[in-house]
Amino acid sequence: MCIRDSILEVLLAVGYLHSVGLIYNDVKPDNIMVGSDEVKLIDLGAVSPINGYGHLYGTPGFQAPEIVKTGPQIASDIYSIGRTLAVLTVPIEMRKGRYVDGLPDPATTPVFAENPSYYLLLQRATAADPAERFASAEEMSTQVLNVLRETVAVHTGVPRPALSTVFTPQRSTFGTDLMLAPVDGFFDPDQAAFYDPVDIARALPVPLVNPLDPAAGLLTSAALSDPRQTLDSINAARAEGFVSILGRRVNDGHPSLEIDLAEARAHLELDDVDTALALLREISVHHGNSWRVQWYMGICALMNDEPELAYERFDEVLGAMPGEVGPKLAVAGTAELIGRWLSDETDHSPGSAQRITELYDVAQHHYHDLWLTDHAIVTAAFGLARLSVAAGDYDGAIRPLDEVPATSRHFNTARATAVIALVHGRDPSEVTREQIVEAARRLEQIPDSEPRKARMVLIVLGTALGWMHANPDAAHGSGEPSTLLGFPFTEHGIRTGTERSLRNLARQTRTNRDHRFMLVDLANYVRPDTLF
């Protein structure tokens, strides 16, 4: 049985003690007995009631630093479990016979460098402030399991998907059409997709209702209600003292965190960001600055075109929930967005290039791990492709796009994106003959019913023509294959194909005469020289 599986068993046992009001107090490797198929906690002599002062037992290096002031608490056991996991998996320095506090530098610790989520997990479990640790053994167990699943998927290449117990699935995708902007904006640049922070905000998952919240039962059943209906229900409940929701009258206007979050979320769905933000600030005062509040703060920041602030919020959520898909997707999306905005600036400040590289590295890391963990997260596949193209790694861009399942509604979009990744976005002289041929081969596999196909044919043929101008010796038709998209792979053949494709597209353009005339003019310009 591996170490992390053993810790899951320990968390289960300690969680049971907590459920009956007891604290184990002395979790450490010496008190864990691992058999072939089970794990046992031994030496129960230090077990005491929660808040039970008196003799405080524990082992330096594993014992929570605040226990003398607070007495035995759930948070103190969480700390000891985190320290135990750290000592068993990474090198912790010893001084005067005890392990020193803290964790080693993640940059110089291979386990952390290879598994950043694991570092975040230990960081939260062993936080100096008990309020920043996992709230329960069950919560920590869920995150340990999620991090373990991600680690196995990344190291084996075999996806390990699972539904989250604290987040909904992703509500929609974002960024799937971005690389097809040259196709969609062929006639009108305004028709091309762009990286919109609001699209990211609306696509991200949202936190599930905490089942321990007093209003959980009613709010869970109403989670998908129309936002106006949600607001009407909450206002009516508030007017009657929340009797219908809580089963008793309360005078407090904020008796439940989840009621307040449902109200803020409803305003966000109605695009009323200012009201939602004001509510979230009020919620922080009444219920504390939990990761759920930070999540919605991040959504507000995205909708207000403040990606830097959103990035900070989502990064805090990731630190609290290191095994969750939602925060990783949010951090990746906002990091890429900031990097794109910085790249588009004409006046680059000193250090901006390094900042862009750092942001893209963060985005690439999370997209990569998300995609390897779950092939249903197609947003991550397209994100990986974009960042690979930005880095000049065109083979790396194709790989995740080819892995998009045929059952996905984005399957044809992924195939089209792979074609564009091979031939567009750089000088034709930098494109290879092999890439042009591969793009054409892939394009022929896309059904003719795909609306973008005719424009993509023009892009591939146009790139081939530009490549021939940059490589004059290639214009004589040497090399295999001898044809491209049904036309001879010579300058004359490619010009003929380009002309024919332009005229076909002109015939299909019936609603905009300017576009039609432009296509005819282009066809006349590129057609091969003839005697008539």
Where are these regions (language model features)?
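Conserved catalytic-loop aspartate of Hanks-type protein kinases
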Residues: 77
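Terminal C-lobe "cap" of eukaryotic-type protein kinase domains
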Residues: 131-132, 139-154
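Conserved C-terminal C-lobe helix
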Residues: 113-128
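Activation segment signature within eukaryotic-like protein kinase domains
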Residues: 6-7
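Conserved activation segment of eukaryotic-like protein kinases, specifically the C-terminal portion
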Residues: 53-66
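Catalytic-loop of the protein kinase fold
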Residues: 18-34
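Regulatory extensions appended to serine/threonine kinase catalytic cores
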Residues: 154-263
